[in-house]
Regions:
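Short, Lys/Arg-enriched N-terminal segment that forms or immediately precedes the first helix
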Residues: 18, 23-44, 144-157
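Short, amphipathic alpha-helical interaction segments positioned at domain boundaries
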Residues: 122-159
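Winged helix-turn-helix DNA-binding recognition segment
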Residues: 60-118, 176-209
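A short mid-domain helix/strand-loop element embedded in enzyme catalytic domains
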Residues: 138-146, 170-185
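Generic N-terminal amphipathic/basic segments
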Residues: 1-16
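Helix-boundary capping/turn motifs
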Residues: 24-28, 46-51, 68-72, 143, ...
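Short, charged/polar micro-motifs that form catalytic or ligand-binding hotspots
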Residues: 40-45, 86-90, 154-161, 192-199
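Detector for short helical micro-motifs
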Residues: 45-66, 159-179
Length: 209
């Protein structure tokens, strides 16, 4: 099909479990915000969106198996709705895997020759470099579940920006914590401390949603 799911996920109906430590693992340490930013601390732009979308997709596909996957880059490019998934999209995916590895989110085992499919192993989403394990939901290991509709509906269309995708995740977490689920708020005064994201990202994300 158009998204390449015929090759794909074995966790139908389960969505992607994302630890709340991805938002803030310690005061001042925000893995999602750092993933959205360039390594020099600048805005992540389109690259930030691709990194976040690809990591979420890997969690969806690989979190329930041995936490690794051996799928061609074109599969991921189709899953993310990239143009020209067999060529340009695939190159973008491969360069993004390399960036995610440098940042401590994945391990890449490259094939024996140029053009061979790499094995991608998911690591802990806090970017600690620790092996991935399925979150338990117990104290200290809480998580949100990203609905598979993100990929199947799909919600993850080209119109969704990096800030929009980040705010989508923040909304899922806020909804889970809210007492009044009919009216969610994202106060500017606490937003940066909680998520490490700028006021500009908050505004752009809310507008995009």
């Amino acid at each position: 099909d158009g998204m390449g799911l015929s090759e794909g996920p074995s966790r139908r109906g389960l969505g992607a479990p994302v630890r709340t430590a991805f938002f803030m693992k310690a005061p001042g340490e925000h893995p999602m915000a750092s993933l959205m930013s360039g390594r020099q601390g600048s805005g992540g732009g389109r690259g930030g969106r691709t990194r976040l979308a690809l990591l979420l997709s890997l969690i969806w596909v690989a979190s329930g198996q041995d936490h690794s996957t051996h799928r061609p880059a074109s599969f991921w490019a189709r899953l993310l709705g990239m143009p020209d998934p067999g060529e340009t999209g695939a190159r973008t995916v491969n360069s993004t895997w390399a960036e995610l590895e440098q940042r401590g989110f994945v391990k890449v085992q490259r094939g024996p020759h140029a053009g061979a499919v790499s094995q991608i192993t998911l690591l802990d989403e806090s970017a600690s470099g620790a092996p991935y394990r399925i979150p338990t939901g117990s104290e200290g290991d809480r998580y949100i579940r990203v609905p598979e509709a993100l990929w199947l509906a799909p919600v993850l269309t080209p119109e969704v920006t990096g800030p929009g995708l980040a705010l989508y995740l923040v909304t899922l977490r806020t909804y889970g914590l809210a007492r009044n689920k009919d009216r969610l708020t994202f106060p500017a005064g606490t937003f940066h401390d909680r998520y490490g994201l700028s006021e500009s990202t908050r505004k752009k994300g809310l507008k995009n949603l």
